[in-house]
Swiss-Prot record:
Entries under InterPro entries matching the protein: ATPase_NBD (IPR043129), Heat_shock_70_CS (IPR018181), HscA_NBD (IPR042039), HSP70_C_sf (IPR029048), HSP70_peptide-bd_sf (IPR029047), Hsp_70_fam (IPR013126), ISC_FeS_clus_asmbl_HscA (IPR010236)
Record protein name field: Chaperone protein HscA
One Pfam family recorded for the sequence: HSP70
Single Gene Ontology MF annotation: ATP hydrolysis activity
Record has ATP-binding as a keyword: yes
PANTHER family given in the database record: HEAT SHOCK PROTEIN 70KDA
Chaperone in keyword set: yes
Cited function: Chaperone involved in the maturation of iron-sulfur cluster-containing proteins. Has a low intrinsic ATPase activity which is markedly stimulated by HscB. Involved in the maturation of IscU.
The species this protein was found in: Escherichia coli (strain SMS-3-5 / SECEC)
UniProt record similarity statement: Belongs to the heat shock protein 70 family.
BP terms from Gene Ontology: iron-sulfur cluster assembly
Length: 616
């Protein structure tokens, strides 16, 4: 399937003119930029031949530095040296302070509760810091390619929510970049490996970077990359390995827990150096703050084993979501510098029953995949037959009568996607409808997550069920959700784009999925009860209107029978007996059959009054 290339006005390229595109891996610890030259994707190095750019920015009154220069200042000016800013993206200040209580920065809250970092250059938000990193990467690409970039593909963790994805887009725009697409990091890795090997089947992408962990189960078939399931933890990565080892070194060296920032940075640097060395050596000598000691790989493995186990539990959940067994996975792709840790490779190999793939540099594989995709999207490969299908992590739907959730787009549906369902009014003369957008796997509103609310007004005043409202859910390639409600006869509509100020955590996603399984039987019963109660309310509402209009058609005895049946239905509808409510509804229907027939006859007579048979 070829991707259709559509050029914007004024941007149409000559038949043989290549556009300049780049793939950017905006990482927590390090970032990279890559491009396709002479048909090969490659990462771009700086003047000293270094491909990685530390995701660190040092701010001063007169300017700022990014990367290695910034990192060298970290120990001397910790408060003005911002690192791992990706972890702060799209989060509220309260969330950040709860998750990361030991950050060496001073924060202030903006009016909407988002974080502002105090620096020598003034108050800066995470979007601005990310933009400065992107500018440095773009400058490297512009110099290497001898021209301005026509577009970029930027990778994000699969578990990034709407706010985090939107923040990444905002940072790119602030950096002056045209974003062709945001691409999930595991999907980018699949592109890098899938195109090279031409392999078909199920592949697991294990991505353990500096600050995030993602596991994706993908199916590769005839050039189609389909994500069957995703999982992970946006607050777990190699940085956590570093901090555990730094704390261990601090304890061994007898350094106070609340020492100054310079010593803390020195401890962290020593831990990082030791971690890297232990990937090749059985032990390493550490010198820090006047203390010298030996640390073995065995000690390091003992420290990080619980974190590695957490990643494997996420792998197990993702496999279950995908409906595949570990032995069905053909290959395991390792992504992220932290996958160089021997214990990680060993445990992942044991879990999947095969040695993981590491033939492409795990630091570079995501950027390479992004560059390949950017080259296609910018129009340099119009005959490409690659199609990307990402998925949404949790079902999306609407609240309906009775506090029920009607799922419109199920979990793990490939995106981009658009789905629509028709709804109707519940009461006579209803002229407005409240649209409550929900996220989650449970059957009741109280057990799902509220995403947004908006109202559709201007609905024609018709009998209950007379107006028809089409609600459309659209999730774009970046995972952003738009919901539109339109009344069919008038065309009146209202819409909303879901951009929460802060997002859903990975543990909450895992918990919601787990709860949906644990309470499945209970939820089905609760839904059946709620549906019967809604039907009872509808029947009573309709009957009340009919009696108010045409009670004269009934004898006293008939009216009493109907009133008794209605009273009984009203009573049992307050309880929890589904069968009793259903039987009471049937009884009301039975008692009102003759009444309904008389009302129909009366309506026909009124319609024919004054007309001859010939006219009919």
């Amino acid at each position: 399937m070829a991707l259709l290339q559509i050029s914007e006005p004024g941007l149409s390229a000559a038949p043989h003119q290549r556009r300049l595109a780049a793939g950017i891996d905006l990482g927590t610890t390090n970032s990279l930029v890559a491009t396709v030259r002479s048909g090969q994707a490659e990462t771009l190095a700086d003047h000293e031949g270094r491909h990685l750019l530390p995701s660190v920015v040092h701010y001063q009154q007169q300017g700022h530095s990014v990367g290695y220069d910034a990192r060298t200042n970290a120990a001397l000016d910790t408060a003005n040296t911002i690192s791992s800013v990706k972890r702060l993206m799209g989060r509220s200040l309260a969330d950040i302070q709860q998750r990361y209580p030991h950050l060496p920065y001073q924060f202030q809250a903006s009016e909407n509760g988002l974080p502002m970092i105090e620096t020598a250059a003034g108050l800066l938000n995470p979007v601005r810091v990310s933009a400065d990193i992107l500018k440095a990467l773009a400058a490297r690409a512009t110099e290497a390619l001898a021209g301005e970039l026509d577009g970029v593909v930027i990778t994000v963790p699969a578990y990034f929510d709407d706010a985090q994805r939107q923040g990444t887009k905002d940072a790119a725009r602030l950096a002056g970049l045209h974003v062709l697409r945001l691409l999930n990091e595991p999907t980018a890795a699949a592109i890098a490996y899938g195109l090279d090997s031409g392999q078909e089947g199920v592949i697991a992408v294990y991505d353990l970077g500096g600050g995030t962990f993602d596991i994706s189960i993908l199916r590769l078939s005839r050039g189609v990359f389909e994500v069957l399931a995703t999982g992970g933890d946006s607050a777990l990565g190699g940085d956590d390995f570093d901090h555990l080892l730094a704390d261990y070194i601090r304890e061994q060296a007898g350094i106070p827990d609340r020492s100054d920032n310079r010593v803390q940075r020195e401890l962290l640097d020593a831990a990082i150096a030791a971690k890297i060395a232990l990937s090749d050596a059985d032990s390493v000598t550490v010198n820090v703050a006047g203390w010298q000691g030996e640390i073995s790989r065995e000690q390091f493995n003992e420290l990080i084993a619980p974190l590695v186990k957490r990643t494997l539990l996420a792998c197990r959940r993702a496999l279950k979501d995908a409906g595949v067994e570990a032995d069905e996975v053909l290959e395991v792709v390792m992504v992220g510098g932290s996958t160089r840790v021997p214990l990680v490779r060993e445990r992942v190999g044991e879990f999947f029953g095969r040695p993981p793939l590491t033939s492409i540099d795990p630091d570079k594989v995501v950027a390479i995949g992004a560059a390949i995709q950017a080259d296609i999207l910018v129009g340099n490969k119009p005959d490409s037959e690659m199609l990307l299908l990402d998925v949404i992590p949790l079902s999306l739907g609407l609240e309906t009568m009775g506090g029920l959730v009607e799922k419109v787009i199920p979990r793990n549906t490939t995106i981009p996607v658009a789905r629509a369902q028709d709804f109707t009014t519940f009461k006579d003369g209803q002229t407005a409808m409240s649209i409550h957008v929900m996220q989650g796997e449970r059957e009741l509103v109280q057990d799902c997550r509220s995403l947004a609310r908006f109202a559709l007004r201007g609905i024609p005043a018709l009998p209950a069920g007379g107006a028809h409202i089409r609600v459309t859910f659209q999730v774009d390639a970046d995972g952003l959700l738009s919901v539109t409600a339109m009344e069919k006869s008038t065309g009146v509509e209202a819409s909303i784009q879901v951009k929460p100020s802060y997002g859903l955590t990975d543990s909450e996603i895992a918990s919601m999925i787990k709860d949906s399984m644990s309470y499945a039987e209970q939820d089905v019963k609760a839904r059946m009860l709620a549906e019967q109660k809604v039907e009872a309310a509808r029947v009573l509402e309709s009957l009340h209107g009919a009696l108010a209009a045409d009670a004269a058609l009934l004898s006293a005895a008939e009216r009493q029978d109907i009133d008794d049946a209605a009273a009984h239905l009203s009573e049992v509808a307050q309880g929890d007996d589904v069968d009793a409510i259903e039987q009471a509804i049937k009884n009301v229907d039975k008692q009102t059959q003759d009444f309904a027939a008389r009302r129909m006859d009366q309506s026909v007579r009124r319609a024919l009054k004054g007309h001859s048979v010939d006219e009919v």
